[in-house]
Amino acid sequence: MKKSFLFTFTVLTIFTILVIGVAPEKLTTCSRFLSQKSGKCVKEDCDRMCKQKWPGKYTVGHCYGQFKDAKRCLCSVCGPDRQPP
């Protein structure tokens, strides 16, 4: 009886540890407008400024607005439970 309880407890413990370790990371998406001087948004500059303000491999900058008249820089940060400050 004691051995079967110990065996069951060990199997359940190992199973629980494996399930917790394999659980996928929760992803969140955060987008913030970056204050920018007046003028046209340039994608390369927008991307660079976003990565300076919110460093990380998930940070991307996009120009937001009418196609060629985009005037705002939108920073998107997508990562495991990460929010821009």
UniProtKB/Swiss-Prot annotation:
Predominant location category: secreted
Transmembrane segments: none
Alphabetical list of InterPro entries matching this protein: DEFL
GO (cellular component) term, any one: extracellular region
Signal peptide: 1-24
Disulphides: C30-C78, C41-C63, C46-C73, C50-C75
Keywords on record: Antimicrobial, Disulfide bond, Fungicide, Plant defense, Secreted, Signal
Pfam families named in the record: SLR1-BP (PF07333)
Recorded family membership: Belongs to the DEFL family.
The name this protein goes by in its record: Putative defensin-like protein 142
Annotated source species: Arabidopsis thaliana
